[in-house]
């Protein structure tokens, strides 16, 4: 409760001014489940203008949605006015938001009962939709009619399966049936929003369970490049996903499991950044090389430790070996390299020009590369005079 105590003064101040205020959302859910708590959110009957008038230190980040960031004890907290939403447009966003003075009206618009629990500053739960019962049963249940909730915002279906992966809960029967019925509405949702949820699914503690639900609800058939991937997705559930430490590894392994032959095309379709695409593809290419031969100094040097570690963890998952000794071996090999990057070489292009007494040209870059590989392979010591002598012995000067 310590994390909530730091924000309690906000609720107390709002109440002193005649308003209602409660902790709400994921932080309350995670407190009940006894999971690490992230951002603390507060809901209040005070209008945004009233919140800003009460708290001098604020940032008006989302006034149209009723959200003001209040800075208290050096920490930022989202304070949002109780609100209800009108008819939704395109199965993803409300056409308008109305501020209300009722906590119940605010909670009833939320996605799942476990996320619709409010808490007073004293720690008393306000549970109007049996959210605690759902948590006790480890079930994901929509607030009210599941069909209505998913037709309001189709992304909620993806969020539901993401929660299966992150919490290990199961979809309640009617909720699951509604996902099967309304899954096609996911095609109205921007792929960027789907990608965020899918990544949380892949990196969840119960990823295998989440992937199984993705198949059982047929939701996968409404996702880009996955329409025909049922058998391959089921194959993915046969592996252990626990060894991955980054989202890059999870995506690389996922692409391996579904047999994606054009990973760059897939990732661009899912709107990944160029940097992330580059890293994921680098891991997959490194694994291809790794299958052909074990690590040697040149391969490890050219790959770099970051990609090498990730590649090894994914490769270990592929061959179903999870003792982590191979990753440690890669780290040991890398630490033993004479140089870790070209910047550590004790020779420059100018040195070569002076020694060879030749005009600049492509030969300089080629010779630098030859020297670099020789240093990495241990054929020459990374000292200027040693490099010069080695070049002379090899008749390269």
Curated annotation (Swiss-Prot):
Source organism, top-level taxon: Bacteria
GO molecular function: ATP binding; CCA tRNA nucleotidyltransferase activity; magnesium ion binding; tRNA binding
EC number: 2.7.7.72
Pfam families: PolyA_pol, PolyA_pol_RNAbd, tRNA_NucTran2_2
InterPro entries referenced in this protein's UniProt entry, alphabetically: Bact_CCA-adding_enz_type3_sf (IPR050264), CCA-adding_enz_C (IPR032810), CCA-adding_enz_firmicutes (IPR023068), NT_sf (IPR043519), PolA_pol_head_dom (IPR002646), PolyA_RNA-bd (IPR032828)
Chain positions recorded as CTP binding sites: 26, 29, 110, 153, 156, 159, 162
Catalytic activity: a tRNA precursor + 2 CTP + ATP = a tRNA with a 3' CCA end + 3 diphosphate; a tRNA with a 3' CCA end + 2 CTP + ATP = a tRNA with a 3' CCACCA end + 3 diphosphate
Known function: Catalyzes the addition and repair of the essential 3'-terminal CCA sequence in tRNAs without using a nucleic acid template. Adds these three nucleotides in the order of C, C, and A to the tRNA nucleotide-73, using CTP and ATP as substrates and producing inorganic pyrophosphate. tRNA 3'-terminal CCA addition is required both for tRNA processing and repair. Also involved in tRNA surveillance by mediating tandem CCA addition to generate a CCACCA at the 3' terminus of unstable tRNAs. While stable tRNAs receive only 3'-terminal CCA, unstable tRNAs are marked with CCACCA and rapidly degraded.
Note: A single active site specifically recognizes both ATP and CTP and is responsible for their addition.
Full protein name: CCA-adding enzyme
Organism the protein comes from: Bacillus cereus (strain 03BB102)
